[in-house]
Amino acid sequence: MINDIKKDAQERMTKSLEALGRNLAAIRTGRAHPSILDTVKVTAWGSEMPLNQVAAITVEDARTLKIVAHDKNLSAAIEKAILTSDLGLNPSSAGTTIRVPMPALTEETRKGYTKQASGVAEDAKVAVRNVRRDALADLKKLTKDKEISEDEERRAADEIQKLTDKFVAEVDAAFKAKEKDLMAV
């Protein structure tokens, strides 16, 4: 029972950390990276589709993404989707190939993105702490139902706290790495 609670808590905390990684990857740095366009949806064949399903996205150089549409008729729709996204990117089209240069980040935008990354990291910490709260509540219920002793509850609670501390430290490390990446000129 206790092991199930700890295992569930660890799995949920791991999922929170993975979500943090995806969310931080979506925050633009000065470098070109295909994950920047993960949020872009293209109207294709009568429905909204993620850009990576209708085109191949590659890194051409440090500051340019190259997009090749699977269907040449979608080039205009892809270009429009990138322009209308709130990423501040300005694609240029040449036949079926679309190039997306990454504009250099100003100090102000760097600080804004750092603040956004900080918020994402804080949300991840809250998620990890909510998992801890749920696990501790489950332990209390087991103690109340006399399925485990108070000593076992305390030991398990300490282990869950250590797990929480470990994941919060990983969240902090991920944020610090992203902050360093954002502030590098």
Swiss-Prot record:
InterPro entries, alphabetically?
Ribosome_recyc_fac, Ribosome_recyc_fac_dom, RRF_sf
One Pfam family this chain carries? Answer: RRF
Q: Name one GO cellular component term.
A: cytosol
Reading the lineage from the top rank, the first entry is Bacteria
Arranged from A to Z, the UniProt key words for this protein are: Cytoplasm, Protein biosynthesis
Q: Name one GO molecular function term.
A: ribosomal large subunit binding
Localization (cell): Cytoplasm
What SUPFAM superfamilies does the annotation carry?
Ribosome recycling factor, RRF
GO terms of biological process kind: cytoplasmic translational termination
**Sequence similarity:** Belongs to the RRF family.
Q: What does this protein do?
A: Responsible for the release of ribosomes from messenger RNA at the termination of protein biosynthesis. May increase the efficiency of translation by recycling ribosomes from one round of translation to another.
| Protein name per Swiss-Prot or TrEMBL | Ribosome-recycling factor
What organism is listed for this UniProt entry? Pseudomonas putida (strain GB-1)
Gene for this chain: frr
